[in-house]
A protein has these predicted regions:
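DUTPase catalytic domain/fold
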Residues: 1-147
């Protein structure tokens, strides 16, 4: 497992810094920096009170927490949310209540998402007239079966 150093800034001194729940987890828990109630199918931009400086060649991916998704229907609208290395603004999460009938209460300090930081290559695109053939070809969207 490789390690990188990421600078993080508390925009609110009361905010808890993200951490891994377990040493081998991929995602750092992000917490809400505000109280809110989401009605069924309502979405909201939620503050975390944090800003980060990712190293060049890395990106952050904000993803839902599986327990909140299955138990309450809380998800993230633009899953995964992308944080580019040159972004220095506040980390915010666009959450949505997918439960058809129940409100979801979010308290300041609740874990609402996970931040996964990954190395990302810079890609050089080369335009060609034809692509190489594969067994799959242009089959997609269920072409390999559903069971």
């Amino acid at each position: 497992m490789s390690n990188i150093t990421v600078n993080i800034k508390r925009l609110d001194p009361t905010v808890e810094l993200p951490k891994y729940a377990h040493p081998t987890d991929a995602g750092l828990d992000l917490r809400s920096n505000e109280d809110c109630v989401l009605k069924p199918f309502e979405r909201r931009l939620v503050s975390t009170g944090l800003a980060i400086a990712l190293p060049d060649g890395y990106a952050g991916f904000v993803q839902p927490r599986s327990g909140l998704a299955i138990k309450q229907g809380l998800s993230i609208v633009n899953t995964p949310g992308l944080i580019d290395a040159h972004y220095r603004g506040e980390l915010k999460v666009i959450i949505i209540n997918l439960d058809p009938s129940n409100n979801i209460k979010i308290n300041k300090g609740d874990r609402i998402a996970q931040l996964v930081i990954k190395e990302v290559p810079t890609v050089n695109l080369i335009e060609v007239e034809e692509l190489d053939e594969t067994d799959r070809g242009n089959g997609g969207f269920g072409s390999s079966g559903v069971a």
